[in-house]
């Protein structure tokens, strides 16, 4: 089985700049293959092994979902009771709680995270009205679980989820002893410590064998009807739906249950094929996802008849269409934690626009979509304390209604080729047309 796995992994690491890759396959509750290649620490020349833990990024979400569902089965919380902001736990688990996109990371062991998540934990749409991937929704789930059980998420997940499955080394934490060093896309090491306001969305650590086992054994923890509800996925695209903490394939082909994860120095994925009794985990210690994807496609292509990448990889891009807004100027504000920040937008010929905020202006291409009148990204710094921490780019996504452009402004950073991965901060935005 997978006799050429070593050569495939070596090629993927070389072609895509991944220091290491760890792979595991489990069948009916037993690990049947576990291999690791490359270096867990390039500076110290420490090899990766099958016992090396890796950061999981968003593959943490299925663990948090399992903890919430266990608490529900124990009668400690109700998946359909409205909670913070009016969203139910079921809606939050499905990323349908109405909360916008967000992530924040603080690197190193010292100091406190610089971004307070509270001002960003707001509704951008009515709960239940649509899908939007929301780390802060999983932050709220962690709070709900803690209020219901009296234990913080990490402790409860260890005692009621991971421990009962025999996965004692699997954890939610700010660091993990012996873990693979995380590396930027150009090979620089990240600091060992990592903190965020959304640990239940992002701060899992595990070895590949542990993750492969979790991906197929979590239903043992739940009542049959709850396990079935986890896989009751609402469509998010042609080939995928999102259930309670897992992506679930749709349409023709094998049933696949999966979740990927990516952040600074992390590209991870877990996939199970319940009808075959198989699960696979692939972990790497680089921001770039290409090596992970190449290895995963090879393994699943060999083991799962009918596998196609679109059955596990959500595509959140929205097709563009030509801009229909006339040339002219718009003015308004971005609502930031400090208050309203002035913003001006000038529509230019050739599907371009000039954006001005504070003392910075930039011209960039813009486009429309079926739901947005205008979207674009500009190399301008939103002049707020939070954005200055690590979000030097400003994206705008605006719809047109009743003569006004409304939507959101996203302060973020493109990748980690300079410094480390920054934060993604969503702000309400409203502009009105200026007289010509």
Regions found by a protein language model. Name each.
Residues 336-371:
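N-terminal glycine/threonine-rich, aromatic-flanked beta-hairpin/loop signature
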Residues 2-10, 158, 317, 331:
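Short amphipathic alpha-helical segments
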Residues 252-258, 325-331, 350-354, 369-385, ...:
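Short, hydrophobic/aromatic-rich segments at coil-to-beta transitions
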Residues 283-344, 349, 411-436:
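Short, gly/Ser/Thr-rich active-site loops of penicillin-recognizing serine hydrolases
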Residues 30-32, 41, 85-264, 268-269:
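Short, surface-exposed loop or secondary-structure junction motifs
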Residues 269-271, 276-286, 408:
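Short, well-ordered beta-strand elements
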Residues 1-56, 76-80, 108-110, 114, ...:
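Short, conserved catalytic-motif segment at the N-terminal edge
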Residues 358-404, 414-415:
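Contiguous, well-ordered beta-strand patches that form the walls/edges
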């Amino acid at each position: 089985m997978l006799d050429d796995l070593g050569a495939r992994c070596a090629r993927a690491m070389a072609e895509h700049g991944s220091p290491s890759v760890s792979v595991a396959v489990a069948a009916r509750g037993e690990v049947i293959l576990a291999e690791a290649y490359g270096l867990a620490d390039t500076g110290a020349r420490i090899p990766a092994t099958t016992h090396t833990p890796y950061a999981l990024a968003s593959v943490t979400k299925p663990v948090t979902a399992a903890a919430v569902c266990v608490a529900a089965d124990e009668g400690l919380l109700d998946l359909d009771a409205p909670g913070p902001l009016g969203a139910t736990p079921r809606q939050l688990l499905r990323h349908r709680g109405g909360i916008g996109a967000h992530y924040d990371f603080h690197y190193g062991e010292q100091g406190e995270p610089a971004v307070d998540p509270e001002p960003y934990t707001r509704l951008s749409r009515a709960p239940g009205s649509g899908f939007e991937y929301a780390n802060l929704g999983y932050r709220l789930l962690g709070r709900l679980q803690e209020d219901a059980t009296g234990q913080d998420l990490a402790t409860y997940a260890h005692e009621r989820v991971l421990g009962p499955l025999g996965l004692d080394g699997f954890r939610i934490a700010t660091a993990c002893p012996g873990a693979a060093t995380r590396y930027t896309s150009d090979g620089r090491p990240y600091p060992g410590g990592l903190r965020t306001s959304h640990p239940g969305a992002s701060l899992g650590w595990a070895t590949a064998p542990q993750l492969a086992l979790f991906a197929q054994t979590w239903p043992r923890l739940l009542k049959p009807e709850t396990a079935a509800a986890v896989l009751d996925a609402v469509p998010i695209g042609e080939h995928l739906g999102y259930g309670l903490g897992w992506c679930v394939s749709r349409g023709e082909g094998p049933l696949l249950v999966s979740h990927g994860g990516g952040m600074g120095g992390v590209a991870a994925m877990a996939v199970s094929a319940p009808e075959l009794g198989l699960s696979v985990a692939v972990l790497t210690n680089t921001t770039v996802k290409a090596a992970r994807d190449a290895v995963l496609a090879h393994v699943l292509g060999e083991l799962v008849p009918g596998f196609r990448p679109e059955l596990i990889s959500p595509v959140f891009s929205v097709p563009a269409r030509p801009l229909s807004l006339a040339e002219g100027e718009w003015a308004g504000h971005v609502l930031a934690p400090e208050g309203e920040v002035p913003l001006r937008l000038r529509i230019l010929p050739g599907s371009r626009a000039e954006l001005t905020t504070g003392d910075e202006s930039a011209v960039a291409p813009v486009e429309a979509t079926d739901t947005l009148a205008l979207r674009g990204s500009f190399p301008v710094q939103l002049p707020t304390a939070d954005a200055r921490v690590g979000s030097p780019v400003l994206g705008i996504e605006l719809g047109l209604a009743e003569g006004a452009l409304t939507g959101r402004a996203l302060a973020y950073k493109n990748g980690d080729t300079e410094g480390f991965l920054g934060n993604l901060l969503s702000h309400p935005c409203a502009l009105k047309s200026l007289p010509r």
